[in-house]
Amino acid sequence: MSLRTQQKAVVFSGLAFIAMAVLHIPDQIFPHGFDKNAPVQLVTLLIVAALYSIFIALKSERFRFHKIAIYGAAALIASQLISLLASGNLIGSLVGDSGRFVGSISVFALLVTSIFHSQFRFEPFITLVRFYIVAIESVALAGIAQHFNLIEFPGAEGVSATLGNTDFFAAMLGTTFPLILFLALNSSLRGRVILGASGALNIYALYLAGPLQGYLDLAFFVVGIAIYLLRRFIPRPQWALNLRTALGTFAVIIWAEFIFLMPFLGDFIPVLGNDVQVKIRSNFWLAGTRQFSDHLLFGVGPDQYGNNYEQYRTIEDIVKYTNILSNDAHSASVQTLATVGIVGTLAFLFLIALVIRSFLIIWDRRIIDRKSLFALALFVFIYLTNSFVSPITLSHKFIFWAVCGFIVGQVYRLPSRRSERKFSKMALPLLSALILLLVATLFTQAQLNYLSHIERYADDNSVVQEYKASPMLPCFMYFDAELLMASNLGPERAAELSREELANNPRCVAAQIYLTKTAVNRGELPGLKELVYRLYEIAPARNDTISLAMYYANRSGDVKLREALERQMKTLGLVYIPGQLG
């Protein structure tokens, strides 16, 4: 690829990430929209990945890989497709049904992102990382400005900035320190001064943010540097590459397992063991392991954790945190096991092993300066650590997949080979671009349709407007508002909307409750059993579930259901008082 073309690729990718990091839906345009950050990130990612795919198709001679890398990508795609088809919620699993939109389509887009970044040599990649740091520092500055009420962004208050959440903010800034070090190692004195100021800015922003994970990231960064400086005193056996790769991969698994056990160890883990946020996560993780144990091979479906959470949450979780409903496991390891099962997890693990192997080969062959390589490895480690304890935004995932793609590309990308363009080589990336653009278009259309209607409803709660819901929008975040709009057209339209939602997402609890309540209010006992039993299956501990199910059990004489409900109520500490619904 010519120098000019590579420069254009660097500039485009850099600007694309800046857009992904800072773009959002301003409150002035759609003030009543629920989430003004994640939808924009998804659309931006899909469009950028589609353009990457077109570039890959046009420059296919640059994207030739060893078979092991091809097998890894193919395994990931295949496992995602199988989990997608087996989920029972095709569109929800494709786009994502947690409100953060991390379904299969985002995985495909991130894989394309990784492939695109595999083409870069060291010097262009340094320039690219500069763009990425500019974007992250823009987010940091925006967060600080918001903290002092100079500007205001949608989402949480304080320093959440364009990410909408202080945890997301802290995670992104905390993982940035190794990238700043990477640039400092490859910059002039003036550049190092600027980068030092950027690091200080991030520390100050983390101080304002408050989440403990940001300080832990900084601590891991300092410990990592100390290990590198003291490496000559650390025994390093001359083991074979395969053994070191296996040990590195196993170490990642053990580290993820240790983090999983942390909330259960309590006082054995100083500071963190009894942290409130850590304790809450233990309940999320137990729900995830129960989902996994019931769907071992392919999981409950990509990004379907939230739709299965109420069925699998523990009694302790229900009693302690009755009003907390989690749409995410808050752990990449638990979320992956629960949603894509053993097969999908092994596919991701294979790619992690490939990244580790690439780092080792580059280290041995000195393809890249070892200090710079260590900084990138430290970034990967700190990112993975964050992902094991917290949700990660799509813009944050973008950087991780970009770095991993670059590393793997240094080892497993074959030299370019001039040849005639064959449609067979262009077909797959062009098909990828078409799918990504199609999903982006349909998702954007669904968002705009929802936002425009919800604004009219917010202005006048009695307005009667025809609204056509889209399966692209999650039940968890959107259905309640959709139901309010539909109710203005009458109960029949609201019931029709609920049935449409359940046809696409059989685990939409709000829709199931509405249909069950409607049947109860109408005294439709014959058809009530199926509705009640389904509701009891997907949300057994909800007050609405217990009340409606008890009504049916008493009216129909269903002794078995009544006994199950009484046991459930006793466990939850509830007292049954006969009334209108029982």
Where are the predicted features?
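Alpha-helical transmembrane segments of multi-pass inner-membrane proteins
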Residues: S2-Q28, L42-I56, A73-L85, G103-P235, ...
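Short, hydrophobic transmembrane alpha-helix segments
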Residues: I25-A38, A57-F63
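Membrane-interface interhelical loops and short amphipathic "cap" helices
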Residues: D27-K36, G88-S98, F148-L163, I318-N327
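Membrane-interface helix caps and helix-loop-helix hairpins in membrane proteins
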Residues: G92-D97, Y207-L212, S387-L394
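Flexible juxtamembrane loops connecting transmembrane helices in multi-pass membrane enzymes
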Residues: G158-V159, F221-V222, N242, W255-S293, ...
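TM-adjacent membrane-interface loops and short helices in multi-pass inner/ER membrane proteins
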Residues: N165, S282-S326, S333, V340-A347
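Internal/C-terminal transmembrane anchor helices
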Residues: R244-L261, E420-Q447
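C-terminal luminal/periplasmic domains and tails of membrane-associated envelope-modifying transferases
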Residues: Y457-G582
